[in-house]
Amino acid sequence: MPPRLPGPQGLRSLTLCLRPAVASPAQALQPLIQTANISQKEKKRKMKQDPYGWAQAQQRKAVNVKRQAELQAQRDAAWGDPVKGITTPFVESFDSAGQASVSPPKVGPDGQLVEEPKPLPTSPHLRNYLLNKDEFDSAIQYAEHILKPIKAEDRLTADPEKEDEEAREHAARHAKAVAALERIAKLEHGGAKDRKHANIRRCIETFGRHITDQSLERPTPPLARGVEPKPQPVRAGPDTGSSEVQIAILTSKIRALSKALEGHGGNRDKNNKRSLRRLCHKRQRLLRYMERKERGSGRWHHMLETLGLTPATWKGQITL
């Protein structure tokens, strides 16, 4: 008969774990997490230990925060607005089509003067209906000449008193007609469409290469090393299709449309808001093209300074 050996009664006395133990990662392999802010308790402890050093640290922090705010304000001002850019006197003169010599004074809500009127560039030679001063004056002189009463060839039978009376009547009628034509052809009495056409002519006169090639010091971009300049053909007429002219025309349209949207009910005008977005994107494409082709030239700097265009108008994404 085999001997009986004592053994454990059941599995209660077993302390073995059938699951494999999860080994904790080594301390050296764990990532280091650094916190920039200390707790309030630590702040109070440091403040009690060294109040003078704590005050100096807070003073340095305040100076740094103030300087960072100033630099951010400068960067924001240099970046500008993607729609309006920086309002220059030439851009502000678009509102009156170059007929107002000073800007309207800005008044606050309490009636106090906020900003003094500034001088604006003018174009007094422009008239309504696509006329200018020379054409208007020549038409008046021609009308006066053909309507002037003719004196009798036979001076023996002529009546001097009647001729003088007819001359006075003609002068009075001519003065009345000239005053009426002046009122009709005045740009101040025109509408938005008339101001748009006048601003287009002003943009051509200001940024057209038939003008800037003669007035700017270095209109074209510098040539690459070893590239010989080629003779350019003589321009046959005014420049109406260059990039700077088209950008100036788009800027005048964008300003008129943005001012209309800022008025009463502009937030509900979805159609004009879409038109404004399309104009801004079209100007952005032209500016990127011109920056690639004309960067460093007098045309590029002259356009940016006159129209007040900032990097926000052609860099990054424009969302309205």
UniProtKB/Swiss-Prot annotation:
<comment type="subunit">
    <text>Component of the mitochondrial small ribosomal subunit (mt-SSU). Mature N.crassa 74S mitochondrial ribosomes consist of a small (37S) and a large (54S) subunit. The 37S small subunit contains a 16S ribosomal RNA (16S mt-rRNA) and 32 different proteins. The 54S large subunit contains a 23S rRNA (23S mt-rRNA) and 42 different proteins.</text>
</comment>
<dbReference type="InterPro" id="IPR005290">
    <property type="entry name" value="Ribosomal_uS15_bac-type"/>
</dbReference>
<comment type="function">
    <text>Component of the mitochondrial ribosome (mitoribosome), a dedicated translation machinery responsible for the synthesis of mitochondrial genome-encoded proteins, including at least some of the essential transmembrane subunits of the mitochondrial respiratory chain. The mitoribosomes are attached to the mitochondrial inner membrane and translation products are cotranslationally integrated into the membrane.</text>
</comment>
<keyword id="KW-0687">Ribonucleoprotein</keyword>
<dbReference type="GO" id="GO:0006412">
    <property type="term" value="P:translation"/>
</dbReference>
<protein>
    <recommendedName>
        <fullName>Small ribosomal subunit protein uS15m</fullName>
    </recommendedName>
</protein>
<dbReference type="InterPro" id="IPR009068">
    <property type="entry name" value="uS15_NS1_RNA-bd_sf"/>
</dbReference>
<keyword id="KW-0689">Ribosomal protein</keyword>
<dbReference type="GO" id="GO:0005739">
    <property type="term" value="C:mitochondrion"/>
</dbReference>
<comment type="similarity">
    <text>Belongs to the universal ribosomal protein uS15 family.</text>
</comment>
<dbReference type="GO" id="GO:1990904">
    <property type="term" value="C:ribonucleoprotein complex"/>
</dbReference>
<dbReference type="GO" id="GO:0003735">
    <property type="term" value="F:structural constituent of ribosome"/>
</dbReference>
<keyword id="KW-0496">Mitochondrion</keyword>
<dbReference type="InterPro" id="IPR000589">
    <property type="entry name" value="Ribosomal_uS15"/>
</dbReference>
<feature type="region of interest" description="Disordered">
    <location>
        <begin position="37"/>
        <end position="60"/>
    </location>
</feature>
<dbReference type="GO" id="GO:0005840">
    <property type="term" value="C:ribosome"/>
</dbReference>
<feature type="region of interest" description="Disordered">
    <location>
        <begin position="214"/>
        <end position="242"/>
    </location>
</feature>
<dbReference type="Pfam" id="PF00312">
    <property type="entry name" value="Ribosomal_S15"/>
</dbReference>
